[in-house]
């Protein structure tokens, strides 16, 4: 009835499941580090999959993408998020990050971290 082959037929649904898994993993690591995970969505339709904020107010922004083919789109979204921050009211994020299902973790030339989900917690 089900199985991995069914998910490959519906890659959008697989992406939703991956986002849920990655958010769960971020939540586990956040709690262990006295931080909280939020979802960001503003009145202009800009969305960021996860914001991890420490008690002191420092935070990091995360986009979660199953496939590496969505990295550029995710990076542009994170940059737009950062550009829209009113720094008279809040600080910029300490880091911008993209969690992916595959690939090697690395820092892009623009400073955005691309993190393979298998690297979380290491």
What positions do the PLM features span?
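A cross-kingdom feature that marks ATP-driven nucleic-acid transaction machinery
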Residues: 1-122
């Amino acid at each position: 009835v089900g199985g991995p082959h069914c998910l490959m037929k519906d890659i959008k649904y697989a992406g939703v499941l991956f986002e849920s898994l990655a958010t769960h993993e971020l939540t586990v690591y956040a709690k262990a580090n006295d931080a909280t995970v939020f979802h960001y969505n503003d009145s202009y339709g800009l969305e960021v999959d996860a914001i991890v904020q420490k008690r002191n107010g420092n935070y990091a922004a995360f986009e979660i993408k199953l496939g590496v083919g969505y990295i550029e789109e995710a990076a542009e979204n994170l940059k737009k998020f950062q550009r829209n921050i009113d720094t008279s009211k809040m600080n910029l994020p300490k880091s911008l990050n993209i969690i992916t299902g595959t690939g090697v973790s690395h820092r892009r030339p623009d400073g955005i971290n691309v993190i393979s989900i298998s690297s979380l917690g290491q």
